[in-house]
Design a protein with these regions (language model features):
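N-terminal pre-domain/capping segments
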Residues: 1-101, 140, 144, 257-265
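Gly/Pro-rich active-site loop or hairpin
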Residues: 17-31, 86, 163, 179-235, ...
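Conserved radical SAM core fold
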Residues: 10-12, 77-82, 114-117, 204-210
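Hydrophobic faces of well-ordered beta-strands that scaffold small-molecule active sites
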Residues: 3-7, 49-51, 71-76, 108-110, ...
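Active-site acidic/histidine proton-transfer and metal-coordination neighborhood
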Residues: 66, 81-173, 182, 250
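Generic structural signal for well-ordered alpha-helices
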Residues: 34-38, 57-62, 93-98, 129-136, ...
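Structural motif
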Residues: 43-44, 102-103, 196, 232
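Acidic-and-aromatic substrate-binding clefts and catalytic sites of carbohydrate-active enzymes
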Residues: 48-60, 79-89, 116-120, 152-157, ...
Length: 265
């Protein structure tokens, strides 16, 4: 298994400001100096990095190679359930896939499925499933492996909602252990249940108060998850993510790498 890091540890995430008036330009973006962040991830000892689509828009040719990093994945997302804007959203995801291909990414990860003011309907899940199939096709056209990332504050947070969407789409599964645990899921059980759909994973820890913390400081059973991955002969990327953390991101990145290496033995 290879170990990467999500660049949002240094700056979090915002939507690109142009997207306020142009859905097709509503890229995710970690503010700040992406090249500096790449240097910090490399200095911590990681092999790869995951970047938001908006950071790839700004990335200079050769930046990854200069730091000795592989692009494990590019992360994008959309509402997916509003038919009138879906073509604009898919245009943006196609752009993310093009950028991912250009910079040598292996995976296209998408989150989303908008929460309405009313509970999600079966039609919402049908629309989400069909849109994710289109995302999968876009990714594959560009040589990327497509996965869906459940996330708090979307219509797919926990186990019951996972069943709803995965019954309606062929896209792969990128589990985010912190988000799944925060939504009431058992990450170990979910790894075993969906083992044949998982080509990529986010290692993220969370407290009972839903604060994201360095690995091993929260509620996630990482030893159990890693055992489930081994049982499934998983040999892909483990991407560590730690956003919204008040501590030193550089020290946390080093500690997280040591923690994962300890799990892998």
């Amino acid at each position: 298994m290879r170990i990467g890091y999500q660049a949002n540890a240094w700056g979090g995430v915002v939507g690109h400001p142009v997207g306020v008036t142009s859905i097709k330009d509503l890229f995710y973006l970690t503010p700040g100096d992406t090249d500096d962040t790449l240097g910090r991830i490399a200095a911590a000892g990681y092999e790869g990095v995951e970047l938001f689509d908006g950071n790839l828009v700004e990335l200079a040719d050769g930046a990854l190679e200069a730091h000795g990093l592989a692009l494990a994945g590019v992360y994008s997302g959309a509402n997916f359930v509003f038919p009138d804007v879906l073509p604009e959203e898919l245009w943006r995801i196609r752009r993310a896939a093009e950028l991912g291909q250009r910079f040598g990414a292996e995976h296209l990860v998408v989150g989303g499925g908008a929460q309405r003011t009313e509970p999600a309907t079966l039609e919402d899940y049908e629309r989400l499933g069909k849109a994710l199939d289109e995302v999968a096709s876009i990714a594959e056209e560009h040589g990327l492996t497509p996965t869906y990332h459940p996330h708090l504050s979307t219509i797919v947070e926990g186990p019951d909602q996972l069943e709803q969407v995965f019954a309606r789409t062929r896209i792969g599964f990128c589990p985010d252990l912190g988000h799944l645990a925060a939504a009431g899921g058992d990450p170990v059980e979910l790894m075993r249940r969906y083992a044949d759909r998982i080509p990529y994973i986010h290692y993220k820890d969370v407290t009972e108060e839903v604060a994201f913390v360095p690995l091993g400081q929260g509620t996630v059973d990482f030893a159990g998850v890693t055992g489930a991955l081994r049982d499934a002969a998983y040999d892909g990327w483990i991407v560590v993510e730690l956003d919204g953390y008040d501590g030193d991101p550089d020290a946390a990145a080093r500690d997280n790498l040591s923690y994962v290496r300890g799990l892998l033995g």
